């Protein structure tokens, strides 16, 4: 019987060897994810940016700093949650990953979620949301904050990606994302 840590290490090693799509050709590092494997809440973004590609860590650039700040404002310590992305290699020029690239990485994300087995997943942005609704085009603006029933009784809470907040600085958008994080917290099952 493997521990969660051992299982996640197996996933990580497989991601490092992956050549299933062209994104592997230009990566500096794969960005598998990081955080608490015993968490009840997982945050999923789109894909690594330049800083993430350099460091091999998710959400460490400007959007990551904002995510950490939003978590703190919600009473969540970053080290208490798990943070990852749909794709594990940086798309060139930080473009949106193609459906083919997302599909090539999808089984890795599914494995991560299966290992952690959270109660709730926060989908950060339209690309992450698309993964949880089988690739359908859904407007994040229309569905954000509304829980989506997903595999194994998990709830997915869509919200805006922190990079969207950086591009559209607004106290109202910030308030909305904080509200969505609070809603996600409400789906965490109490132990015992």
Curated annotation (Swiss-Prot):
InterPro entries linked to this entry: UDG_Type-4/5, Ura-DNA_glyco_family4, Uracil-DNA_glycosylase-like, Uracil-DNA_glycosylase-like_sf
Alphabetized SMART domains for the sequence: UDG (SM00986), UreE_C (SM00987)
Entry superkingdom: Bacteria
Pfam families recorded: UDG
Any one Gene Ontology molecular-function term assigned to this protein's record: metal ion binding
Binding annotation for [4Fe-4S] cluster: 18, 21, 89, 105
GO BP term, pick one: DNA repair
Reaction(s) the record says it catalyses: Hydrolyzes single-stranded DNA or mismatched double-stranded DNA and polynucleotides, releasing free uracil
Positions of uracil binding: 45-47, 59, 85, 161
Keyword Disulfide bond included in the entry's annotation: no
EC numbers: 3.2.2.27
Activity as a function of temperature: Remains fully active after heating 15 minutes at 85 degrees Celsius. Completely inactive after 15 minutes of pre-incubation at 95 degrees Celsius.
Keyword annotations: 4Fe-4S, DNA damage, DNA repair, Hydrolase, Iron, Iron-sulfur, Metal-binding
Annotated domain remarks: The seven N-terminal amino acids are important for maintaining proper protein folding and increase temperature stability of the protein.
PANTHER family, per database record: TYPE-4 URACIL-DNA GLYCOSYLASE, TYPE-5 URACIL-DNA GLYCOSYLASE
Family: Belongs to the uracil-DNA glycosylase (UDG) superfamily. Type 4 (UDGa) family.
Function: Removes uracil bases that are present in DNA as a result of either deamination of cytosine or misincorporation of dUMP instead of dTMP. Can remove uracil from double-stranded DNA containing either a U/G or U/A base pair as well as from single-stranded DNA.
Record protein name field: Type-4 uracil-DNA glycosylase
Organism the protein comes from: Thermotoga maritima (strain ATCC 43589 / DSM 3109 / JCM 10099 / NBRC 100826 / MSB8)
Organism placement in taxonomy: Bacteria, Thermotogati, Thermotogota, Thermotogae, Thermotogales
Gene responsible for this protein: tmung
């Amino acid at each position: 019987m493997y521990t969660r840590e051992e299982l996640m290490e197996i996933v990580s090693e497989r991601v490092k060897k992956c050549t299933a799509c062209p994104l592997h050709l230009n990566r500096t590092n794969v960005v598998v994810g990081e955080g608490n494997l015993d968490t009840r809440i997982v945050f999923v973004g789109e894909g690594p940016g330049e800083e993430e590609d350099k460091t091999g860590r998710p959400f460490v650039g400007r959007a990551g700093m904002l995510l950490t700040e939003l978590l703190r404002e919600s009473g969540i310590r970053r080290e208490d949650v798990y943070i990852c992305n749909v794709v594990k290699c940086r798309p060139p020029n930080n473009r949106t990953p193609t459906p083919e690239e997302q599909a090539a990485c999808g089984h890795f994300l599914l494995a991560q979620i299966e290992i952690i087995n959270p109660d709730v997943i926060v989908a950060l942005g339209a690309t992450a949301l698309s993964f949880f609704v089988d690739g359908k085009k859904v407007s994040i603006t229309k569905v954000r904050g509304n829980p989506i029933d997903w595999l194994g009784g998990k709830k997915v809470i869509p919200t805006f990606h922190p990079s969207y907040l950086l591009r559209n600085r607004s106290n109202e958008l910030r308030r909305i994302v904080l509200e969505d994080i609070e809603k996600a917290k409400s789906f965490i099952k109490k132990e015992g």
